[in-house]
């Protein structure tokens, strides 16, 4: 009376790995290095021994039903290598400790600690970069050294800049005429402060007589220059050619700061109509330049100009003025 329904039967399909479940190292290469400490990334299942060798910075854990994930436990990148290569975030290393940019069988991932890329706030690279940047022959990028030093000398922990300054002082006291010492002196000047001024002056005063004669004439002027400076209101650093053309890194602090006292001059000269004969000439002085109708503007030697003025002035007879003073005093006494 009744009817029935019979469905055809078929054997279930065999298990087959998919691209989502099978571990595939090449597909993980771009994702895994960026995983941060304590974070995980799913990798599928059945990770072979090559996976553990390729990613020694990770623990391999089973999540569920044979599916696995990698969990970062450390950063194994060499600190020195990572500190001196700002753009390097990770690399691959073989059994002979050779470094490569690309993965190949037998190589292991080495990731740089993110703190090696934040030299503005991290102190992880300070000791390494102090030693490397001190050595002019180390091959380290000087631009990177300058960037790092700008941060390191301003660390909240004052023991860090003190340690750096002590090491640079020891080196530069023996000779400051090199890029390493000039960069350091430059940063101390930028930071400023009495303490840094004292450090700079201490180093410069320990230079050899030959160094001072060649590079520090502004700070050690001749007797004639001192004689002129005593008779001029404007700071000597503003007109002494030895100061104007000097290397500011090799100026003692007093001379360096006096440069900020110099005035800026602006001259406007306008002549609408001027008739002169062939025997006449016009010379106009505008601060540090002489402007002539016959010559192009020429820079004037200020020191010589001041010396000429003093030489052409009359000599003061102090004895004569003293006698006059006594006579005036006696007359006033008699009148009173």
Curated annotation (Swiss-Prot):
It comes from Fowlpox virus (strain NVSL) (FPV). It comes from the Viruses. InterPro entries: Pox_virus_G9/A16. The lineage of its organism: Viruses, Varidnaviria, Bamfordvirae, Nucleocytoviricota, Pokkesviricetes. Belongs to the poxviruses A16/G9/J5 family. Residues 1-22 are annotated as: Disordered. This is Protein FPV127. It holds the Pfam family Pox_G9-A16.
